[in-house]
């Protein structure tokens, strides 16, 4: 068992009428299993990305830099926005290139996520770590715990499969092609066998 990892929180930097975020897609290494190092992908870190915090009716501007050495993208899953800012398979970011989307947040308060959506390799890149959570706040947000990482806990559940050397195995069996990829190890925020000790009586998991 090990302490639950909590992704860092990025609420952006407000200037020139928008809330600005700087996101770097990068390669890294992460220790999932004792004594083993695993090659991963991450956003502003080795594995997964920071939790982005948006506000409803606020304009956000994002600088997405692709430093992983292959084409990628970032898609804002569940958001209502123009197709030019969507980050879908039609908006590939070439290696060593930068994409600068911006949009008005029209979503109500909720929990969303962002992830690679590049053609042909989205599954593999997300499997290796190119994904993160988005929290949207609005003026009608109910009075529930909202102290991030203290009584408001992000829970990113993933199933993964590892080789004996700690490497991530993706679609490496025939049945994966037929029935879909299913790992044999559960992760929570990239942590195997996580433990959390609540410091409050009321705890929010999202």
Predicted stretch roles:
Residues 1-206:
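Histidine-centered copper-binding motifs that mark active-site loops
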């Amino acid at each position: 068992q090990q302490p639950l990892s909590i992704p860092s929180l990025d609420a952006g930097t407000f200037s020139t009428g928008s809330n600005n975020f700087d996101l770097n897609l990068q390669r890294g290494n992460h220790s999932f299993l004792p004594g083993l190092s695993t090659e991963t992908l991450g956003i502003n870190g080795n594995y997964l990305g920071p939790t982005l915090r948006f506000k409803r009716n606020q304009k956000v501007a994002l600088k997405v830099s692709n430093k992983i050495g292959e084409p990628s993208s970032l898609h804002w899953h569940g958001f209502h926005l123009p197709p030019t800012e969507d980050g879908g398979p039609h908006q590939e970011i070439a290696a060593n290139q930068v994409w600068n989307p911006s949009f008005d947040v029209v979503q109500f308060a909720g929990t969303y996520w962002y992830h690679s959506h590049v053609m042909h390799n989205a599954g593999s890149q997300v499997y290796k770590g190119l994904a993160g959570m988005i929290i949207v706040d609005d003026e009608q947000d109910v009075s529930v715990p909202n102290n991030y990482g203290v009584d408001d806990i992000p829970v990113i559940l993933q199933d993964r499969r590892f080789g004996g050397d700690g490497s991530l195995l993706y679609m490496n069996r025939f049945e994966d092609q037929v029935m879909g990829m299913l790992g044999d190890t559960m992760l929570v925020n990239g942590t195997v066998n996580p433990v959390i000790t609540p410091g409050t009586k009321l705890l929010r998991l999202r």
